[in-house]
Structures are given as structure tokens and as C-alpha cells.
């Protein structure tokens, strides 16, 4: 009997089975930026501003770095449970985060676009903190270290968040 989290058992839930019959498949992404097939064209800055994102045990996290000015996603990152991913070359500007937590990531390819989502224990949040990576033409390098842990089904982070739904997470 395995634990109810990604990689610890081979039990397919009825929801996952229904999704598989509609073209979805289980996937174990590596940590880092998703490729452009996920619908986000990554935007890079000239300086090495970065986020270090550390995830505790029990859940993986998909993170969207959102421009405060345009409310548009500039980077879409996957961080597997128990790992740290460094997101380099964040452009100057102000950002907030959208976070999807969960287990059992599944993907479905439709044409040249790939959809992805957690299919067990999924929940979604948005940061209320604004991460300021400096003014345009500044030479100062800015870095943030984010620590994300899920304890008893809720996130315990070193930044503030509010709950959002899956649709709000998906909207760029």
C-alpha cells in the first residue's frame, strides 16, 4: 500500500481514468521552465535577477510569474516536491505569483498546444506579495528566495497568498 502522492503508487483514480480516455497522460516533468507548448512564451531579462523556489515534501508546484502591470505570465515553472529550482534572468519589473499545488501531473496535447494540471490533491493560490525586480535600466541585481511547504493540506510559505480557483490560475 503506497502513499497517496505522485510516484508512490500505481493506483489510477476514476477521474484520471476518465481523463486518460480523453487523451490525457500522466507525466513527471523535470524542474524548471515548461516549454512553449504549454502556451507561455518565456520572457528573459538581461540581468541575472532570479527566484530560488524551494518546495517541501508531499506536493509539487507549478508556478506562474505574472507581470503586475499587464497581468500576463512571463514564465511558467514546475518544481517537483523536495527540490529547489532557480528561475534566472527575470526581467526588471514587478511581479506576483500564481501557484498550483498537487500530485499526479497530467498532460494532454491538442495540436501544438499542451495542457497540464494536477489530478490529485490540487489547490491554487495567488501571492499577495509583490516581487520588485527593479526599475528599467537599473544595474542592481535582485533575488528572492521562496520557500513553499504544504502542511495538513494548506500552504506554509515565506510569502503571503490568497486562494484562487483553477480557472483563475489558468487565465493569463
Predicted features, each with a name:
Residues 2-69, 73-75, 102-172:
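Primarily secretory-pathway and cell-envelope proteins
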Residues 76-80:
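Short, acidic Ser/Thr/Gly-rich low-complexity loop/linker segments typical of extracellular
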Residues 82-87:
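Short, surface-exposed beta-strand/beta-hairpin micro-motifs centered on an aromatic residue
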Residues 95-97:
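A short tyrosine-centered beta-strand micro-motif
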Amino acid at each position: 500500500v503506497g502513499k497517496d502522492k505522485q510516484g508512490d503508487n500505481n493506483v489510477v483514480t476514476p477521474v484520471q481514468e476518465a481523463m486518460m480516455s480523453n487523451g490525457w497522460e500522466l507525466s513527471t516533468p523535470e524542474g524548471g521552465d515548461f516549454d512553449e507548448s504549454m502556451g507561455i512564451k518565456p520572457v528573459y531579462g538581461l540581468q541575472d535577477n532570479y527566484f530560488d523556489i524551494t518546495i517541501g515534501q508531499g506536493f509539487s508546484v507549478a508556478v506562474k510569474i505574472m507581470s503586475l502591470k499587464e497581468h500576463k505570465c512571463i514564465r511558467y515553472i514546475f518544481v517537483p516536491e523536495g527540490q529547489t529550482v532557480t528561475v534566472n534572468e527575470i526581467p526588471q519589473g514587478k511581479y506576483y505569483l500564481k501557484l498550483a499545488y498537487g500530485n499526479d501531473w497530467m498532460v494532454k496535447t491538442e495540436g501544438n498546444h499542451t495542457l497540464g494540471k494536477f489530478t490529485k490533491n490540487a489547490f491554487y493560490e495567488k501571492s499577495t506579495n509583490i516581487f520588485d525586480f527593479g526599475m528599467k535600466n537599473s544595474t542592481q541585481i535582485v533575488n528572492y528566495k521562496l520557500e513553499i511547504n504544504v502542511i495538513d493540506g494548506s500552504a506554509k510559505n515565506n510569502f503571503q497568498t490568497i486562494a484562487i480557483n483553477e480557472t483563475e490560475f489558468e487565465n493569463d
